Amino acid sequence: MTSQRTRERLIQRLYEEGLSNAHVLEVIRRTPRHLFVDEALSHRAYEDTALPIGHNQTISQPFMVARMTELLLAAGPLDKVMEIGTGSGYQTAVLAQLVERVFSVERIQALQDKAKERLAELNLRNVVFRWGDGWEGWSALAPYNGIIVTAAATEVPQSLLDQLAPGGRLVIPVGGGEVQQLMLIVRTEDGFSRQVLDSVRFVPLLNGPIA
């Protein structure tokens, strides 16, 4: 079930659900999602659903990957994006094909090691990885034109706001319950603009790296 037809069916569904950025949809189409899940689940790779990847984590629903990526790129191309939560590496791979450089932070080293292997297999070389606490971001390489967070924070981390460049965009799910709110935050001349968008379901953004 990893045929081109199943991929096309997924893209058609995303388009019908309101996603319209042709560049994002094309990258979703050509990115082999089945490589980012366990072989036992590969037959479900092109369903529009989140799937388990171990360590109580999931690979995000393709709609949400596309939605968050569209929001990040809505103001134009970006050259420097930080991703909080490498996970399987699928969102990382999508970003790597759309922006100049991706800086990806993951607290679970085993997940990040697998993600590195997958991106190398796809010859995506514009990603730098850090094993660490996503709440802290990666201040040594800040600022970033875009930040995308793939787990739900109970509140917007101040450290991530501090690492956003002027005009930069932060896409993040916020909330402590089972259902959270997807937010778009833009750094302006006099502070930050905040927009609440969709109700979403993400695993929580936790503190502290795990070897």
From Swiss-Prot:
Keyword S-adenosyl-L-methionine on this protein? Answer: yes
Q: Which SUPFAM superfamilies match?
A: S-adenosyl-L-methionine-dependent methyltransferases
- The answer to whether keyword Translocase applies is no
**E.C. numbers:** 2.1.1.77
Active site per UniProt: S60
Q: Which GO terms describe its biological process?
A: methylation; protein modification process; protein repair
Q: Which PANTHER family match?
A: PROTEIN-L-ISOASPARTATE O-METHYLTRANSFERASE, PROTEIN-L-ISOASPARTATE(D-ASPARTATE) O-METHYLTRANSFERASE
Described by its record, this protein's role is as follows:
Catalyzes the methyl esterification of L-isoaspartyl residues in peptides and proteins that result from spontaneous decomposition of normal L-aspartyl and L-asparaginyl residues. It plays a role in the repair and/or degradation of damaged proteins.
User: What family does this belong to?
Assistant: Belongs to the methyltransferase superfamily. L-isoaspartyl/D-aspartyl protein methyltransferase family.
UniProt protein name: Protein-L-isoaspartate O-methyltransferase
Native species of this protein? Pseudomonas aeruginosa (strain ATCC 15692 / DSM 22644 / CIP 104116 / JCM 14847 / LMG 12228 / 1C / PRS 101 / PAO1)
